[in-house]
Amino acid sequence: MKNTALVIGAGIGGLATAIRLAIRGIKVKVIEANGYPGGKLTAFEIKGYRFDAGPSLFTMPQWVLDLFLLANEDPKKHFKYKRKKVACHYFWPDNTQFFAPSERDEFVAKAAKTFNEKPQNFFQYFKRAEKKFNLTRSLFLEQSLHKLKTFLGTDTLKALAHLNTYELHKTLHQANEQNFNNPKVVQLFDRFATYNGSSPYQTSGMMTLIQHLEQHYGTYIPEGGMHQITLSLFELAKRLGVEFHFNTMAEQIITDQNKVLGVKVSQTVFKADMVVSNMDVVPTYVKLLPQYPTPKKIVKQEPSSAAVIFYWGIAKEFPQLDLHNIFFSTNYKAEFEALFQNHAVADDFTVYVNITSKEVPKDAPKGCENWFVMVNTPADYGQDWETLVESLRARILAKLSRQLNTDLEPLIACEEILTPPLIEQKTQSYKGALYGSSSNKATAAFLRHPNFSQRIKNLYFCGGSVHPGGGIPLCLLSAKIVDELSKE
């Protein structure tokens, strides 16, 4: 019987785990090295501009609402959000633009016309992606892949009976290229590989299901911005009696005879019947479990992509931009080869611009916008980031200024910069990778670290570096899996 739990890290996975355990009557403590909750999902303000620091895309809101419903609370009283009518604005170097509607039929009608693509190509693609999701959701996303009982259920038999459906023998790019005729449409759907920090030229065709989450379920924005997800779950956890200790660094997970006893913090040991690490799995082993060898297969796994992010206060409004904006590169393949083969950034690269002031006007002064400008980069292998950031900044400004027909440099009212080394420093993400390990192999789902220790009893893992993967929705599901495992 587990009566007490200690969660290391107050990221989105840690918060969701603490909530689920507290609902069951378990006394939960959360220790967090930073002075605030949220991990990557935080916010800050400069000169009247508010910025969401980390994840900017919100899908599957029902998985947030589930936590309130489990606690017998009305989600509408504590967490409000709205669906976006336009999912994303896409821009290509030849000045082609496509403002992607969220509704499927509207998307197909507009995309077919813009790209001279047959409507049935889209509908067939969406149907196959939906089938993949429905067949594998229970098996791959909502259960541990490292327990025998998972593979003995009817869901497994059903999933295995449709192996050809998953396109595991193809890359995502190959699956997209075989379905669409226009290279721009292929590039648009290739982009979804970046949602888990992978390359469309390496990750499997299974990953067409990623776009299903956005296309079928929609894209949303919380009232007040992405940070409201963190704040609402933090308040829910406190109402449930979860005890938080901020500015508190975990030093070691204490064990005896391969069983968890608690966590050492400074000169104190917080005792607990179970420990859940929301910390990246690599530093969990390296820093907190020195008494055990770090699993070599975890350290050797290829990290996902990282990012350099420029937070710019822009003293002008751009009506042609929306909440989510993508400025594509000319050569997508070269871009990903640079990232994963050369651990570099290509000369021509894709730029993502997120502007929450489009939906939350108070996020920027009147007549201005808050730009979150992101470029995918390799993880930190010791590159000269100072030189790279300087180069990226100049090239981003040149690219966006050209495509928006406006000199952006004089419009920058304030600036903050986030690099992979800073990401690791602030969030303990190994090498600054945003999603733990990459999914550049067809077997990636099975190679991610399980949500429990196979050696240490009552030690569990949640968050983006373990099963089922990175991103807000999957971090929330990792909490659900830990909750179920801890009942055993």
Task: Please tell me what each predicted stretch does.
Residues 2-137:
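N-terminal glycine-rich phosphate/pyrophosphate-binding loop and immediately adjacent elements
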Residues 182-196, 346-352, 406-468:
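A glycine-rich dinucleotide-binding beta-alpha-beta segment and adjacent secondary-structure elements
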Residues 55, 464-486:
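A conserved FAD-binding loop/helix module that cradles the flavin
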Residues 315-424:
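C-terminal segments that line or cap access tunnels to active or ligand-binding sites in enzymes
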Residues 93-203:
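Rossmann-like flavin
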Residues 249-365:
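Mid-domain catalytic core of redox enzymes
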Residues 209-260:
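Helical element adjacent to the flavin cofactor pocket in flavoenzyme catalytic cores
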Residues 163-172, 214-235, 384-392:
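Short beta-strand to alpha-helix junction loop
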